[in-house]
Amino acid sequence: MALSTEEVLAGLAELINDETGIATDSVALDKSFTDDLDIDSISMMTIVVNAEEKFDVKIPDDEVKNLKTVGDAVAFIERAQG
């Protein structure tokens, strides 16, 4: 069963918190990974790998560059889960 947007957001917020220390309540759909959350490319790749494991999805490297906001990542994960 696919997770809800809120469940994916909460799970992604936990992964971001684990990697960067950013408070989970600071992670919102409209937040930019680079501009708002100041996540660098190395941390982003770690978050992507952990998200692939947590949500059982594959995020191709060429798609990662399209994930500008948390909402972009949540939408991608939702689509990938079917």
Give the ranges of each region predicted by the language model.
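Thiotemplate assembly-line natural product biosynthesis machinery
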Residues: 2-25
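Core alpha-helical elements of the protein kinase catalytic domain
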Residues: 14, 49-50
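Two-component histidine kinase catalytic core, primarily the HATPase_c
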Residues: 43
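Residue-level recognition of oxygen-bearing side chains
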Residues: 8, 32, 50, 69-72
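Generic C-terminal helix-cap and adjacent flexible tail
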Residues: 6, 78-82
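C-terminal structural segments of small proteins and small subunits
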Residues: 65, 71-79
